[in-house]
Amino acid sequence: GIPCGESCVFIPCVTTVIGCSCKDKVCYNN
């Protein structure tokens, strides 16, 4: 639920390495 400051519209989330995932075109961490 916490925004990771990254979008995932065109490319995947780089922040997946710290637990973030793509939701609604924005990367979130829980």
UniProtKB/Swiss-Prot annotation:
UniProt crosslink position (Cyclopeptide (Gly-Asn)): G1-N30
Disulphides: C4-C20, C8-C22, C13-C27
This protein's UniProt keywords: Disulfide bond, Knottin, Plant defense
InterPro entries on file: Cyclotide, Cyclotide_bracelet_CS, Cyclotide_sf
Top-level taxon: Eukaryota
Matches recorded under Pfam families: Cyclotide (PF03784)
One Gene Ontology biological process: defense response
PTM annotation: This is a cyclic peptide.
Keyword Transcription: no
Function: Probably participates in a plant defense mechanism.
Free-text domain note: The presence of a 'disulfide through disulfide knot' structurally defines this protein as a knottin.
Entry's family note: Belongs to the cyclotide family. Bracelet subfamily.
The protein, known as: Chassatide C9
Originating species: Chassalia chartacea
